Regions:
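Hydrophobic anchor residue at the start of the ABC signature
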Residues: 144
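A short, proline-enriched helix->beta-strand linker immediately N-terminal to the Walker B motif
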Residues: 149-153
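ABC ATPase NBD coupling module
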Residues: 64-80, 104
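Helix-to-loop junction immediately C-terminal to a conserved catalytic motif
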Residues: 48
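ABC-type ATPase nucleotide-binding domains, specifically the catalytic core motifs of the NBD
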Residues: 12, 92-112, 120, 210
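Conserved ABC ATPase signature
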Residues: 130-134, 138
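Conserved ABC ATPase "signature" region
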Residues: 63-67, 109-126, 177-181
């Protein structure tokens, strides 16, 4: 479960999020729709523990995760996240990026996961490459697959389908929804595309609209 209580965040004195509260149960999906600069990415970074709030609290599974001046580190939150600009490990191959953090899993599970994601996201021919050898769209698909690989309890997706071609975008969208059906994480999916948001709502997601001042519309 993800719970936000009166969450606020400013940059250089400019409010980005103001007193935002929401609760997302395990297995629930929330699509956050709004224009650039309304706080969508900031919301994800606060949930992930990459930033701390100026006011309010973030709780995960009933446990305090963030408040002003203190927060659990990202690795302690069971969160997978994929941002618009994928942060892949440049010195690791694609397959090593996918399996990073799966040290406790059996070899058979790791192999099965890599094969499943490679087939779903059209990565089979890229597994031996390094991030510097990937196009922007390829890197984005690897970043999305890596977010899913650990089957985290919470999944944060920041416009992961941006700049993908129409047919590939539709297939990756469907494959992502199919994959998460297998482990039912709480999902926050950020987009500025009303069509993308509508498709997610049709697949059972709730909708949160953010205005430019970071309040729920």
């Amino acid at each position: 479960m993800i719970r936000l209580e009166n969450l606020s965040k400013s940059y250089s004195g400019k409010p980005v999020l103001q007193e935002l509260s929401l609760e997302l149960a395990e297995g629930a999906r929330l699509v956050v729709l709004g224009p650039s600069g309304c706080g969508k990415t900031t919301l994800l970074r606060l949930v992930a523990g990459l930033e701390l709030p100026d006011a309010g609290r973030v709780s995960l599974d009933g446990r305090l995760a963030s408040q002003p001046g203190w927060g659990l580190p990202p690795y302690a939150r069971s969160i997978g996240f994929a941002f618009q600009s994928p942060t892949l490990w440049p010195h690791l191959s694609v397959v090593r990026n996918l399996t990073f953090g799966m040290n406790g899993a059996s070899k058979s599970h790791v192999k099965e996961t890599v094969e499943e994601l490679a087939n779903a996201f059209d990565l089979t021919g890229l597994l031996g490459r390094y991030p510097g050898q990937l196009s922007g769209g390829e890197a984005r698909r690897v970043g999305l697959a890596r977010a899913l690989a650990m089957r985290p309890r919470r999944l944060l997706l920041d416009e992961p389908l941006t700049n993908l071609d129409g047919e590939l975008k539709e297939r990756i969208f469907k494959e992502t929804l199919a994959f998460i059906e297998g482990f039912h994480p709480a999902v926050i999916f950020v987009t500025h595309d009303p069509g993308e948001a509508a498709a997610l709502v049709e697949n059972g997601a709730s909708l949160l609209r953010l205005e430019n001042i970071g309040r729920a519309a």
